[in-house]
Amino acid sequence: MVCAARNLLERADAATAGMWPRAIALLTRQALEDALIELWSVRASGVEGCSTRAQLLCLPYYLGDEKLAEQAAYAWSGLSRACHQHPYELPPTSAELLAWLQAVEQFAAQVRSVVGKKGD
């Protein structure tokens, strides 16, 4: 999903203006939520049943990297706002989308590392 979001970000043009920011936000947020589910399946089964906001509150303890957990929570919040159309808000800029995308990539890499260590 992250690759698809990155491809959309790199190919955005005037013909798709207004559509691609929300599509990128949806794909990126889904990638973050998938990484959370992967983490909980190994570290704390059952947490995935809680709201994403509650999962993000628990994240620093289980991830082992408080700064990265905060970045993931910040990215999720921004991505969630971007996924919903509000007439009084501008869509996110490509720079914002890229920053959130990079935060999700780092988070997913850390989750893969944590999950891999548990399986060893």
Model features per residue range: what roles?
Residues R11-A14, Q30-A35, R53-L63:
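Short, mixed-charge, low-aromatic patches
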Residues M1-A4, L27, D34, A75-G78, ...:
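Amphipathic, well-ordered alpha-helical segments in soluble domains
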Residues T16-I24, T28, K67, P92:
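Conserved aromatic-histidine-acidic binding/catalytic patches
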Residues M1, T16-G18, E33, E38, ...:
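Solvent-exposed, well-ordered amphipathic alpha-helical segments
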Residues P21-S41:
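Short, hydrophobic, well-ordered secondary-structure elements
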